[in-house]
Regions:
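Acidic (Asp/Glu-rich) sequence patches and key acidic residues
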Residues: 1-184
Length: 184
């Protein structure tokens, strides 16, 4: 895997590349110190009626690793897998973590309501950021699969969900900080 992880917010990535966004990004800003091993996520997905498809070269030891950085999990054999990235406040990708954290703190600084303050606290106190990257043409099944992934990290890692072009969501799934771009 290359040094550059493609997990910048959609607006920053579009501007840097000068091309339309082909992916949908969502994140969970997690306050727990460590990400759970992938095996726990896969067991959670199965308990919710999902059938996650792991990479063919992933071994059992990889499923028990807590310090993973990137993995693709499939939701349907005929569709591209959802890419999961986990960057932490320490280690090799600390700079990526800090860049993401700074970007969202700057976005939230323009809001002065209690919900934005709550989101700011979550972003500030986060120890790792779980990011999902989906193809823009993802199916409804893919959105559901992604939603279960986000819920797992939100519930198990004291996290707050953020979806690009939408905003931050409460644990009940309600939009609490609207980051949509107003239409002119």
């Amino acid at each position: 895997m290359g040094r550059e992880l493609p997990i910048l917010p959609a607006s920053a990535q579009q501007a840097a590349e000068g091309q339309p966004e082909n992916f949908v990004y969502s994140r969970v800003f997690c306050q727990k110190e460590n990400s759970p091993p992938l095996r726990l996520l896969i067991e959670f997905l199965k308990s919710r009626g999902q059938l996650p498809i792991t990479p063919p070269d992933m071994d059992q030891a990889g499923l028990d690793e807590w310090a993973w950085v990137q993995v693709g999990l499939g939701y349907h054999r005929d569709r591209k897998p959802i890419q999961l990235f986990c960057v932490r406040d320490r280690g090799s990708y600390k700079d990526v973590f800090e860049q993401e954290q700074k970007y969202f703190l700057e976005l939230l600084s323009s809001f002065d309501d209690i919900e934005a303050h709550l989101a700011t606290e979550y972003v500030t106190r986060s120890r790792f950021i779980l990011t999902t990257q989906m193809q823009a043409d993802v199916t409804e099944d893919g959105y559901d699969f992604n939603g279960w992934i986000l819920e797992f990290y939100q519930e198990n890692c004291n996290g707050l969900v953020q979806v690009d072009a939408q905003g931050f969501f409460s644990p009940k799934g309600e939009l609490i900080v609207d980051l949509t771009v107003p239409q002119e």
